[in-house]
Amino acid sequence: MPKDASGPPRSLLVLGGTSAIGLATARRLIARGARLVHLAARPSPALEKAAGELTALGAEVRTVPFDALDPESHQASLGPVFAAGDVDLVLLRFGIAGDQARDESRPLDAVRVAQTNYTGAVGAGLLCGAALQEQGHGTLVVLSSAAGVRARRADFIYGSSKAGLDAFAQGLGDALYGTGVRVMVVRPGTVLDPGTPRGDARLTTTPGQVAAAIELGLRRGSETVWVPGGLRLVMSAVRGLPRPLFRRLVV
């Protein structure tokens, strides 16, 4: 795959290759000219189905066995992807929401949320950042969450894992500044599945809307993307609330 340091990405690696946001983004980028897609996830029928759907859109799709919870395997899984040719875009999308009520009483389940969303992402993010720097160009898109801006009582386990991921991604972006590699942090609100009641439009979004925002952010060269855009102002206000008031606020 030839180097394409500017313009729409022609080759991409999706970490979380069965995620709705990852696949929606891949579909949009294929429509804009992407020709090679690596889908990285645990082997499953869902992964093969996703690969088939993207292949039908005209892309060459390669599946990559990847387990976020096994960082010692990341080099063996992802190294060959970069060795095979330049990757213009890496989308780091894997993660789990967990179940707050259950996880509070089952600490090992809470640890699994943290390990998947944060430590797994640290290992994969550093590996991909170094590989992009080695090739001299590329963009790493990291899916954070508005939940990481200020963890709520209702989801502080998940929120704290995303807070760590967000801080890591920002720091990695600073570390890679000037190398030809860019890190873009995406902070969606609550992502709704098809058929789910929408609720407050300032706080919710869909996989398709997140994908569209990612595409726009890539074109603009953005470092941070909020989805929906108005969420930035909402969360800025939430961040500054005194704790006694924040405890009573349902957001």
Swiss-Prot record:
Pfam families: adh_short. It comes from the Bacteria. The active site is at 158 (proton acceptor). NADP(+) binds at residues 14-37. Keywords: Antibiotic biosynthesis, Oxidoreductase. InterPro entries: NAD(P)-bd_dom_sf, Sc_DH/Rdtase_CS, SDR_fam. Its EC number is 1.-.-.-. Substrate binds at residue 145. Coiled coil: none annotated. The keyword Oxidoreductase applies. One of its GO terms (biological process) is antibiotic biosynthetic process. GO terms for molecular function: oxidoreductase activity. May be involved in the biosynthesis of a heptaene-type antibiotic. Belongs to the short-chain dehydrogenases/reductases (SDR) family. This is Uncharacterized oxidoreductase in mprA 5'region.
